[in-house]
Design a protein with these regions (language model features):
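Outer-membrane beta-barrel biogenesis signature
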Residues: 19-51, 103, 144, 272-280
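Residues that define the transmembrane beta-barrel architecture of outer-membrane proteins
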Residues: 53-57, 92-98, 131-137, 173-181, ...
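Outer-envelope beta-barrel architecture signal
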Residues: 32-40, 67-69, 109-113, 148-154, ...
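Membrane-embedded beta-strand positions of outer-membrane beta-barrel proteins
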Residues: 40-44, 73, 102, 115-117, ...
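Transmembrane beta-strands of outer-membrane beta-barrel pores
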Residues: 44-50, 75-81, 106, 119-125, ...
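Detector for outer-membrane/organellar transmembrane beta-barrel domains
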Residues: 37, 132-216
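Outer membrane beta-barrel transmembrane domains
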Residues: 82-83, 180, 184-280
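Outer-membrane beta-barrel translocator domains and adjoining extracellular loop/strand segments
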Residues: 52-58, 82-89, 125-133, 163-172, ...
Length: 280
C-alpha cells in the first residue's frame, strides 16, 4: 500500500473500524418472485475479519405491483463485536437506519436491467455509529445476461453513503458522495447451488465522514481517501428450498490489504405464507 492508504487505514483502525464490501439493504430481492402481492423476507448476515465481527438481523416487508415495479423496506438490528483503539474487547448492539427501496425490473433477452433507489431515515444511534444522524440515499443499477449457466453482470451506483451489500457488513457508517462500480460473473453449478466472483471499486469525492460502530462518539472527517476502496470477492450460494437462502463469501480489499469472511442466511417468509395459504 502507498503512504496515503496506510495513513487512512491507520485512522480507521484507531476508530476501531474495518473496511468491507457487502450487504444489500434489501436481501429480499434475491428470492422475491415477480408476481403481484406482498413480500416478506428475514435475513441474518455478518462479516468477520481480524478486527471483529459485524452481524445484522434484517426484517424486510414489501409489495410487488407486477413484473416491473415493487416497493419494500425494513430496519436492521446490529450485533457488533470487536477490539477498539485501546485493545479492549467491545460490543455494540442496536437498531440501524430504517430504509425503503423503490425497484424497477426490466427483463429482456438481450440484457436484463434492474434499478433500485434506496432512502435511509436516521433511526439509528449516531453515538454508537449505527447512523450518521442524517437522511441518506443510494441509487444502484444492474445489468446482466445469462449464457446458459453463466451470468455476467455489471453494477453501477451513486449515493451519499457507501452502501452495505450482500457480501460485506462494515463496522462503520459513512456520509459523503461516492460512486460504486462492480463487475463479475455467477455460475449455476446445479439447480440449488451457484458460485460467483466479482471485482469492485468505491470512488468517493468531497468531504467524507465515518462513524465507528466500535468506539462510541467517534467521528472521523477527511477527504475522499477516507472511504475509497477496491478489491474482489467470491461467494457460494445455496438454496436448499424455495424458502431458504444460504451464502458464504470471501472478500479481499486490495486497497487496505484486508481479508474478510462473510455469511448470510435468509428465509422468504412471504413465499412460505403464500404457499401455505394456497394449499388451504
Amino acid at each position: 500500500m502507498n503512504r496515503i492508504s496506510v495513513a487512512v487505514l491507520s485512522c480507521l483502525l484507531c476508530l476501531g473500524v474495518t473496511h468491507a464490501w457487502a450487504q444489500s439493504p434489501a436481501p429480499a430481492s434475491l428470492s422475491v418472485a415477480d408476481e403481484k402481492g406482498w413480500t416478506a423476507y428475514l435475513g441474518f448476515q455478518g462479516s468477520s475479519n481480524t478486527f471483529g465481527q459485524v452481524m445484522d438481523l434484517d426484517s424486510n416487508l414489501g409489495y410487488n405491483f407486477g413484473p416491473h415495479f415493487s416497493l419494500d423496506g425494513g430496519v436492521p438490528i446490529y450485533f457488533v463485536r470487536g477490539t477498539n483503539a485501546l485493545g479492549n474487547s467491545v460490543s455494540n448492539n442496536g437498531l440501524g437506519d430504517m430504509y425503503a427501496n423503490l425497484r424497477l425490473k426490466f427483463r429482456n433477452p438481450t440484457v436484463n436491467y434492474f434499478t433500485t433507489l434506496t432512502g435511509y431515515a436516521p433511526t439509528g444511534d449516531t453515538a454508537s455509529g449505527l447512523s450518521t444522524g442524517r437522511a441518506m440515499w443510494d441509487w444502484n443499477n444492474r445489468f446482466d445476461r445469462s449464457f446458459g449457466r453463466l451470468t455476467p453482470f455489471v453494477e453501477v451506483g451513486i449515493g451519499d453513503t457507501v452502501p452495505i451489500t450482500r457480501f460485506y457488513n462494515r463496522p462503520y457508517t459513512t456520509l459523503g458522495y461516492n460512486s460504486q462500480l462492480k463487475g463479475g460473473v455467477q455460475y449455476a453449478l446445479w439447480r440449488y447451488l451457484s458460485v460467483g466472483a466479482a471485482g469492485y471499486a468505491v470512488e468517493p469525492w468531497g468531504q467524507q465522514k465515518v462513524f465507528s460502530k466500535l468506539n462510541k462518539r467517534n467521528e472521523l472527517v477527511g477527504g475522499a481517501d477516507l472511504a475509497r476502496d477496491n478489491g474482489f470477492n467470491t461467494w457460494m450460494a445455496v438454496s436448499p428450498s424455495q424458502f431458504v437462502d444460504l451464502e458464504l463469501g470471501y472478500d479481499r480489499s486490495v486497497h487496505y490489504s484486508l481479508n474478510t469472511v462473510t455469511f448470510g442466511l435468509g428465509v422468504n417468509v412471504g413465499r412460505l405464507f403464500h404457499q401455505q395459504h394456497a394449499g388451504q
